[in-house]
Amino acid sequence: AGAILATFIAAGFKAKELEEIFDELDLTKLLDPPKFVVNIPFLKWLNLYKRNGLYRGKLLEKWFKQKLATKGIYCFGDLPKGTLKLVASDLSNGKLLVLPDDLKNYGIDCDRFPISRALRMSCGLPFFFEPVYLKNSKHDCVVVDGGVLSNFPLWIYDNGHKMRPVLGMKLSS
């Protein structure tokens, strides 16, 4: 949820707009199971084994893209540098990714990378959503929710300069 809020705030959404967006949101409409198992519940679990996720995540990414487009935001180049940083986990290399900064390590132009894709990577709950695959020079890298490796990444904003305090909330039981 933090990545979604951070992205929408960076895109220029106001509190009232965010309230309206999330009030009208029906999460079940963003869950897109693989087409061949829609009517056969048992096969959904086979897909978990085969594709590493119950849901594809394409509808979620499409929803992000549509909402961001209303503010004219499509890729990281549409935002001022440093405005948005998202965290994702590269399971293939056991590394935490800070997006867009670390995309250059995969040979990807940071400014042209879709924010909706980065957001999908950052909130892709393992085994619930299929992972996103990023290609590097050696192989495809499996990328999932940043919370796998760093669930509370306030350190991203610590640049050594004195700034306003950053307020974060961590919910746990």
Predicted regions and their residues:
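Patatin-like phospholipase
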Residues: 7-173
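Gly/Ala-rich beta-loop-alpha elbow adjacent to hydrolase catalytic centers
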Residues: 2
